[in-house]
Amino acid sequence: MSSNLYSIGLSGLQSSNARINTTGQNTSNVDTEGYSRQRTDTTSSPVGGVVLRDTSRLVDNFVSSQVRSDTSTFSYYDTYHSMISTSDSLLAEDSISLNTYINNSFDALQTVNNDPTSSSLRQLAHSSLNNLVQQYHTLSGVVSDQEGLVDAQLASSLGDLNTITAKISNLNEQILRQEGISISPANELRDQQELLAKDLSKYLDIKAQFNDKGLMTIQLANGQPLVMDQFPTELKVSSNPLHPKKIDLVVSFGDYEVGLKTQGLGGSVGGLIDYRSEFSVYADRTLGQHAIALADAMNTQNRKGLDADGQFGKDLFSLGDINVYSTADNLNKAKDISVRVSAGQSAKITKDTYELNRTDDNLFSIKKVNAEGKSTDKAITFDPSLLQKDNNGYFKIDELGLDIRLDGIDKIDKDDIFQFTPTEGAAAALGLASRNGEAIALSAPIGVSTGSDNLSDARISLTSVTNTDPETSAFSSDGSLYPSAPHKIYFTSPSSYVVQNSSGVELAKVENVIEFSNLLEKAGLSNEAGFDVSVSSMPKRGDEFSVGTDNIGQSDNFNGLALADLQNQSLIDGKATLVKSFSGFISYVGSKTAEIEGHADSSEIVMNESIARRDRLSAVSLDEEAVNLLKYQQSYSASAQVVTAARTTFETLLGIMR
């Protein structure tokens, strides 16, 4: 009996000692990040006493998984918000607001219209346009600087991420070795591994699981592996010839690489990539669409007037080249494809990417795809051999507002894919083509006069100038009207008139006129002429009105007023003015920032609650450990008394035997 009592007391001592050690371990690691409270389990022995079992970690894998998921979500929105809030504060700053520079430029045009002969006012208007161009560059620089910051942060994050996965893999090896030579679990190593997994979730949305050996494996939310037992993978940035500005990721397995879907990555890496692909691309293309619309509208209108030297106006702005991309094996073919915005057709240009490919021997197709790669419209199919080319080899795709030149058309094979985005980088490439204010075409290219012998008070006025191209209008290359063009309007009655050329030959006759605006349109001649005229009231029989290029005054501001009025025209996508479009863009940035900020705040609350749930189970409580320590100390003392009693009993028995 005494020997049994001795065994019971000894096992109690061992049990109490082990639990005191566990309590001491918990207490000493109260501030250790990632440490999970440990507990030494025991069971009653069938022969008496207590049997020590494992010292295990108090963890709930479901709660730990939730902590990682919520950490990833918060990190995603926090990173996204930090980037977009910077963009919001910069783009919305009044001192660099594009609308301020737009208003200043058009105000300067209005001012010079008051005195078109003033060189100083012309130069002031030219300086305002130059400032506007520089502001496009500034705003584009804000976007590109943020893109550079994303690239730098992403490179750093991937380096840290790959280091973490390597450490997790290394810990798997250590755990396998340590638990193979011991009956106790490698608690501290597993705590380190859990902490690394939590750190990893700050970068990506991951799933941590344990295989049949009890080793941690890491997968992305889409199922792609990052850690397989003792074999880590590596995440890398990969170049994409079709989308050079797009961030592509690959998972390297050492001997081969697999492309990674970048949607829904979560964590800070997902936040950086989504900011770049969603907001940064959108901002760059929005500014580019804005710049294209401004340049095209101003250039088109300036070509309809005469500059200070009496010459037809030329382009005020210049646009950069539109880059054409293709797959790596087709890069040489892409160099033979040129694309530009058709003159006067910028309203048709969208922020989409355009995909060109050859469908068969003769036909090509172009379709528009959005930033997500989804088609946004029906594909346009055309046969280049049937389209008329200009002197530079370009043919028009009217539906898209684009001119295309295919120099190496015979080299292009069926199903070759080429992509280009007209608005990409267009704001950064915008330039001022005119050298000074004298290039601003304020005057109309044609004058009108009312016959001195007319019997009525009706006065003729120039209504519009729509085309000055010598090949398609009444204007010759030297600026004069072709002799065959409309030169005179003669009223045969108050309600009928004829249009005559310079030789008096009748070009058209119109009768039953009750409204006297756009007389050439009524005669069916306005499109060919490229201009139109109106009279102020009902003429009388015999009234004559003339048009020609010798009736232009130096102070004429007809085209200058049209240039200034572009501020009020719906130039962006044919739906919004320049100012309204940029204001809408700033509103979008503000609302997007507020939306992301709301998600960041709410996800932080959810994450903190998950961490608190984990801590309630796994974190060390000094109060609880103090109670346990007192209890185990008392248990140790009691077990020692049992051993003492067993020894006393044994000695008493020996004494009796003597």
Protein language model features and the residues they cover:
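S/T-rich, low-complexity, solvent-exposed segments of bacterial secretion/appendage proteins
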Residues: 1-658
